[in-house]
Amino acid sequence: MMKEHAKLMKVIFSAGEVVGRKKLQKMIYIAKKVNLPFYEKYNFHFYGPYSEELTLRIEELCNLGFLHEVHEKKGGYFQYRYSLTDAGSDFLRHYDVEMPPLKDCILDLNEQNSRFLELVSTVLFFDGLQQEEVKEKVFTLKSKQRYTEEEILEAYHYIDKIKGLVTEELVKD
């Protein structure tokens, strides 16, 4: 049970802090799609790929006292900040998590805004389609986000960049 929880904790530890539930969902999904060992099931929802399993794991880690969740009122909505507690850090020190190196990848993902990660994860969700078909899906399913063709192209370049970071980290290890 705790293996998948520990992987999630390792991501948050590597990031230092993750601001936003949606952002954390997208970071894990993108990491999964670039062959990092995450196994949560994802379905397509309003904000792109979403995993109920991941939401439950986060809740469990908060309940166990391993993850600190801060609710902040920002404008007309609540925003959540996630970081490891001291107990979570202690747990990670004593739990041998089999993970490829991921710090550079996670730090880069964490630097991106949620809107862009939503686009990247949506592009990855439809990775079996041709680029033109993916573009049409984005324009249809994400019409309210008003993504441009340039942003979609940027998402493809970013996916290549993240895959490269993962490969570099594996070679360094």
Region annotations inferred by a language model:
Residues 1-173:
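Domain-edge interaction signal
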